[in-house]
Amino acid sequence: MSKVYMMVTITNRNKRKDFRTFFKEHGLPVFLETTGRGTAQSEVLDYFGLEESEKLLFLAIVTGETWKKLRRGLITKMMIDVPGTGVSFIVPLSSVGGRKTLQFLVNEQEFEKEEETAMKDTDYELLVAIANQGYIDTVMDAARAAKAGGGTVIHAKGTGMELAKKYLGVSLVEEKEVILIVTKSREKNLSLIHISEPTRH
C-alpha cells in the first residue's frame, strides 16, 4: 500500500531549469509551478549578504518511496539543505478526487491504492482544486453548494500535461488555476463530489 503526499519545493526563480530537469530525471514529469517572493526582513538579508529574490514554488504529488529518493537527490545534487537554496517538504493527503486523476498525478511512480484515510483530530482540511483557466467560478460555485466558504486562487503552469490524454482521455492546457479552499472535515467529501461532477463536463 502507498501513501501519497503533496510535495512543496520553494527555491530561487533562477533555479527553474535545474529543478525542472532534476524532477524529470527522477521520474516526476507532472508538477505545477508558480512564482512568489520571500518575506525575510531587509536586515536579515543584509546580515547574510543576500538580496531579495523572486521565489519559485513547485507542487507535485509523490508517494512515500518517491519522496525518499527525491529527498536524497535534493540534498546531494540540488543542495537544498544549504541555507539560501530553498526548502522542500511533504504534506500528507487524505484523498484524491478520482482514480484516473490519481493515476495521472502519480504517473509512473510505483503506487498501490489504499483506502482513504481520515485526518485525526482536525476540524478543517485544505482542498486543493486544479482547474483550467476560466473555471474558477465553476469550482467555487460547486464548493459553496457543499457549504464551503471562500477560496484563494494561485495562477500556475503545469508540466507533463501531455500525459493527461493517456489517463484522463482529454488534453489539458499548461496554464492552470490552483484553488485553495479550507473546509470542515466532515464536509470535505461532499465538497469533493460537488467540485468533481460539474468540472468533468
Regions of interest found by a model, annotated:
Residues K3, K17-E54, R71-T85, G149-E175, ...:
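A cross-kingdom feature marking solvent-exposed beta-strand/loop segments within repeated
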Residues I193-H201:
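Residue-level detector of conserved catalytic or cofactor/ligand-binding positions
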Residues M1-R16, E110-K176, V182-K184:
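Surface-exposed interaction/gating patches
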Residues L50-T66, V173-L180:
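Short, structured active-site "lid" loops
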Residues F58-L59, T66-W67, M79, A145, ...:
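Predominantly single-stranded RNA-binding modules in RNA-associated proteins
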Residues V8, L32, L59:
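Short, conserved beta-strand segments within well-ordered enzyme catalytic domains
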Residues M1-N14, T63, K68-R72, T76-M79, ...:
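Intrinsic disorder/low-complexity detector
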